[in-house]
From Swiss-Prot:
This is Charged multivesicular body protein 6. Belongs to the SNF7 family. Its main location: membrane. Probable core component of the endosomal sorting required for transport complex III (ESCRT-III). ESCRT-III components are thought to multimerize to form a flat lattice on the perimeter membrane of the endosome. Several assembly forms of ESCRT-III may exist that interact and act sequentially. Interacts with VPS4A; the interaction is direct. Interacts with VPS4B; the interaction is direct. Interacts with CHMP4A, CHMP4B and CHMP4C. Interacts with SNF8, VPS25 and VPS36. The modification Phosphothreonine is found at residue 130. InterPro entries: Snf7_fam (IPR005024). The keyword Nucleotide-binding does not apply. The acidic C-terminus and the basic N-termminus are thought to render the protein in a closed, soluble and inactive conformation through an autoinhibitory intramolecular interaction. The open and active conformation, which enables membrane binding and oligomerization, is achieved by interaction with other cellular binding partners, probably including other ESCRT components. The modification Phosphoserine is found at residue 119. GO terms for cellular component: amphisome membrane; autophagosome membrane; ESCRT III complex; kinetochore; kinetochore microtubule; lysosomal membrane; midbody; multivesicular body membrane. The gene is Chmp6. ISGylated in a CHMP5-dependent manner. Isgylation weakens its interaction with VPS4A. It comes from Mus musculus (Mouse). A lipid is attached at residue 2 (N-myristoyl glycine). It is found in: Endomembrane system; Endosome membrane; Late endosome membrane; Membrane.
Length: 200
C-alpha cells in the first residue's frame, strides 16, 4: 500500500520545456532591465536640461555621455531579447518537428505491419482465386443457359405467346364515366327476394 502512494509520478516536463522556460525568464528579466534603464534615461535627460539652465555645462555633458552609454546598453539588450525569442521559437518549432517525425515513424511501423500481414504474393493469390471463382460461375451460367432442349425452347415460346394472347383478349376499360347507381334498384331486388322466399 505504501508503494502506491509513495511512488513519484513521472514528470511530463522535458528538457526542452525547461530550456524554453529559462529562456523566457531571461527575456523577461531583460525587459525589466530595459524598462528601468529607459526610466533612468528620461530622468537623466531632464536633469541635463536642469543643469544647462543652472549653467553647469560640464556636468550636463558628463551626464549626457552617461546617458549615451546607457542607450547603447539598451540597444544591446534589445538584440539579446531578439536572440532569446529566436531561440525559443527554434526550440518550439523543433519540438513540433519531433512530434511530426514520431507520427511518421508510428505510421511507417503500422504500414510495415500491415504489409507483413498482407504481402504482394497474398494479394496476387486472392486475386487469382477471385478470378477463378468468377470464371467458374460464368461456366455454370453458360451450362444452365445451354441445357434447354429445342422442346424446352418451344414450350417457353408457347407460354410467352399464351400470356401475350390473354392480355390482348381482356376487354378494354371504358373511357367514359360509369352511370350513377339507381337507389331504387336495391329496394326492388329486396322486394323480389322477399317474394321468392314467401313463395317457397
Amino acid at each position: 500500500m505504501g508503494n502506491l502512494f509513495g511512488r513519484k509520478k513521472q514528470s511530463r516536463v522535458t528538457e526542452q520545456d525547461r530550456a524554453i522556460l529559462q529562456l523566457k525568464q531571461q527575456r523577461d528579466k531583460l525587459r525589466q532591465y530595459q524598462k528601468r534603464v529607459t526610466q533612468q534615461l528620461e530622468r537623466e535627460r531632464a536633469l541635463a536640461r536642469q543643469l544647462l539652465r543652472d549653467g553647469r555645462k560640464e556636468r550636463a555633458k558628463l551626464l549626457l555621455k552617461k546617458k549615451r552609454y546607457r542607450e547603447q546598453l539598451l540597444d544591446r539588450t534589445e538584440n539579446q531579447i531578439s536572440s532569446l525569442e529566436a531561440m525559443v521559437q527554434s526550440i518550439e518549432f523543433t519540438q513540433i518537428e519531433m512530434k511530426v517525425m514520431e507520427g511518421l515513424q508510428v505510421g511507417n511501423e503500422c504500414l510495415n505491419k500491415m504489409h507483413q500481414v498482407m504481402s504482394i504474393e497474398e494479394v496476387e493469390r486472392i486475386l487469382d482465386e477471385t478470378q477463378e471463382a468468377v470464371e467458374y460461375q460464368r461456366q455454370i451460367d453458360e451450362l444452365l443457359a445451354g441445357n434447354f432442349t429445342q422442346e424446352d425452347e418451344d414450350a417457353i415460346l408457347e407460354e410467352l405467346n399464351a400470356i401475350t394472347q390473354e392480355q390482348m383478349e381482356l376487354p378494354e376499360v371504358p373511357s367514359e364515366p360509369l352511370p350513377d347507381r339507381n337507389p331504387e334498384a336495391p329496394a326492388k331486388a329486396r322486394s323480389r327476394q322477399a317474394e321468392l322466399v314467401a313463395a317457397s
